[in-house]
């Protein structure tokens, strides 16, 4: 009887079964670092400095504003909205930021899973149905306002992560 493959498998078993979990503190630190990186990328885009994140712009009400208390699910939902907006913009300035938002959402999902509260999948948002019309009318304004508000939201998220937000 040939037991070669079985012996090799049994010999490798201790190595295969040893999986070290990533400490949640490391995930939280990586999340904060990525948020700071995204904020820096937004700062590097010079025209985003001209609008306050609190300023109201007619027709751009669908872009989320600041939220003082954020849960992990609210953070994920907010980032999903910004990601949809940024991927709709033709500007090359926002491609990397959009990719970073996807990575940030993945880190938030890890944080949520560590607290046993998996985040629901975010569907296409109804409030963004009119995005195409708004982009045709005011492409530049949409980019500036979206990036400015995203920056403010990310800074809120950074503060909230220090307080260990709930589900």
Curated annotation (Swiss-Prot):
InterPro entries in alphabetical order: 4_helix_cytokine-like_core, Leptin
Disulphide bridges, residue numbers: 117-167
TM region(s), chain numbering: none
Keyword field contains Signal: yes
Annotated signal sequence range: 1-21
Species whose genome carries this gene: Bos taurus (Bovine)
Protein name stated in the entry: Leptin
GO cellular component: extracellular space
Job description of the protein: Key player in the regulation of energy balance and body weight control. Once released into the circulation, has central and peripheral effects by binding LEPR, found in many tissues, which results in the activation of several major signaling pathways. In the hypothalamus, acts as an appetite-regulating factor that induces a decrease in food intake and an increase in energy consumption by inducing anorexinogenic factors and suppressing orexigenic neuropeptides, also regulates bone mass and secretion of hypothalamo-pituitary-adrenal hormones.
Keywords: Disulfide bond, Obesity, Secreted, Signal
Pfam families referenced in this protein's UniProt entry, alphabetically: Leptin
Gene from which this protein is expressed: LEP
Gene Ontology BP term (one): negative regulation of autophagy
Family assignment from sequence similarity: Belongs to the leptin family.
């Amino acid at each position: 009887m040939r037991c070669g493959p079985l012996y090799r498998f049994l010999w490798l078993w201790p190595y295969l079964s040893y999986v070290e979990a990533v400490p949640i503190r490391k995930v939280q630190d990586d999340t904060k670092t990525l948020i700071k990186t995204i904020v820096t990328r937004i700062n590097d885009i010079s025209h985003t400095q001209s609008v306050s994140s609190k300023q109201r712009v007619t027709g751009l009400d669908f872009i989320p504003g600041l939220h003082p208390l954020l849960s992990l699910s609210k953070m994920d939902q907010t980032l999903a909205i910004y990601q949809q907006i940024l991927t709709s913009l033709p500007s090359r300035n926002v491609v990397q930021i959009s990719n970073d938002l996807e990575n940030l959402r993945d880190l938030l999902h890890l944080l949520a899973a560590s607290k046993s509260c998996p985040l629901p999948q975010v569907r296409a948002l109804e409030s963004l149905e009119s995005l195409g019309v708004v982009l045709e009318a005011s492409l530049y304004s949409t980019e500036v306002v979206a990036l400015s508000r995203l920056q403010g939201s990310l800074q809120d998220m950074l503060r909230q992560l220090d307080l260990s937000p709930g589900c």
